[in-house]
Amino acid sequence: MKVSMEKIENNVVKLEVTVEAKKFNEAMKKSYAKNVKKFNVPGFRKGKAPMSIIKRYYGETVFYEDAINICCDDTYPKALEEKEIKPVDYPQIDIVEIGEGKDFVYTAQVTVMPEVELGEYKGLEAKKVSYDVKDEDVENTLKEMQQRNARIQTKEDEEAIEKGNIAVIDFKGYVDEVPFEGGEGYDYSLEIGSGTFIDNFEDQLIGAKKGEEKEVKVKFPEEYGSEELNGKEAKFQVTIKEIKVKELPAIDDEFVKEVSEFDTLDELKEDIKAKIKEGNDKRAKAEYEETVINLACENAKVDIPEVMVENEINNMLKDLEMKLRYQGIDLETYYQYTNSTEEKVREYMKEAATKRVKTDLVLAEVAKAEKLEATDEEIMDRAKEMAKQYGSGELEKTAKLLADSQNALLKADVINEKVVKLIVDNSKEIE
């Protein structure tokens, strides 16, 4: 096999690969063996005709397709390795020369991993990030605990809806006297004053009693997310089926004993404050790291192939689809709800995808420049962390499987973490 390489443009190369006639002839024999049973030739049982006879009846090129695939599948990866090329897309294959007794020659034009010109990534300066724990943060956490432990009581039939009550309702919505999709619900629990429903829907239920039917008039926002409803006036026929009230427990030492491991309110407040501080510190650390990494990326120069951005957008769309699936929504429904299309979403994702690709390329180049590697032990430790997240009872076995099946991913994760640490450790926080 002979391989020559020509640079076509930035990040695009063309390989010319010459496969010896002997090798191509072997590929033709394999193609014949694979396809011979498909041919009916007079004078021969099906699948028994010699190659020469089949070619005479069906043409010289009848076995070329599979022979070409066999040759390319074998030689293309070797050509990439010989020329130390890392492709980021599938190649465009063109046949240059082919024929019985001849060398098989083809070209493969492919987009390759771009070159990265690193700028400064050590000695970077970024503003120090910190978040104080406020008294209101602690109070809000206590109120959330209070809400979670509220007792729900059903109000008497003659009692009316008040703000903060939970109304169990049936409703049906109309626009221009016509019911609209998604405008109907049964036994829906609506907390009055929560702002769950649009406009002043909830306020119009205040004062209503169990068994009462109300007509509620609203106007949808101009940017509601549905072409059918944007800016439209609507009315809802609402039936009040039940009214409930939340009885909030007092936030005192007795409450603390019931909902936590502590005996006094002061002890719980200190614990809440410590946990909020821990979360704030993690947030500040992550934001500082992101700022410094962004600076390192801004200082680097790289011409990113469009196909890499498109591939990243594809990954982002798959992630979105998976998250939506957990909520029982598919992409088409999501597009309808958000008054969008796949094309619009892809365009919206493009900036973030480009940033992700550049960050990955820059971090990989820093790792190369600093000769950072991941040991087998580090990869196994990361696999164990992942296995713990899966909640696997057989930690060692699961970790071993992950270390084998996800080796490249785990290795990249470990190396990236080292790169981030190196850049951050060599940076300077400024006030």
Swiss-Prot record:
GO terms for molecular function: peptidyl-prolyl cis-trans isomerase activity; protein folding chaperone; ribosome binding. InterPro entries: PPIase_dom_sf (IPR046357), PPIase_FKBP_dom (IPR001179), Trig_fac (IPR005215), Trigger_fac_C (IPR008880), Trigger_fac_C_sf (IPR037041), Trigger_fac_ribosome-bd_bac (IPR008881), Trigger_fac_ribosome-bd_sf (IPR036611), Trigger_fact/SurA_dom_sf (IPR027304). GO terms for cellular component: cytoplasm. It is found in: Cytoplasm. SUPFAM superfamilies: FKBP-like, Triger factor/SurA peptide-binding domain-like, Trigger factor ribosome-binding domain. Its EC number is 5.2.1.8. Keywords: Cell cycle, Cell division, Chaperone, Cytoplasm, Isomerase, Rotamase. One of its GO terms (biological process) is cell division. It catalyses: [protein]-peptidylproline (omega=180) = [protein]-peptidylproline (omega=0). Residues 164-249 form the PPIase FKBP-type domain. It is an enzyme of class 5 (isomerase). Involved in protein export. Acts as a chaperone by maintaining the newly synthesized protein in an open conformation. Functions as a peptidyl-prolyl cis-trans isomerase. Consists of 3 domains; the N-terminus binds the ribosome, the middle domain has PPIase activity, while the C-terminus has intrinsic chaperone activity on its own. Belongs to the FKBP-type PPIase family. Tig subfamily. PANTHER family: TRIGGER FACTOR CHAPERONE AND PEPTIDYL-PROLYL CIS/TRANS ISOMERASE, TRIGGER FACTOR-LIKE PROTEIN TIG, CHLOROPLASTIC. This is Trigger factor. The gene is tig.
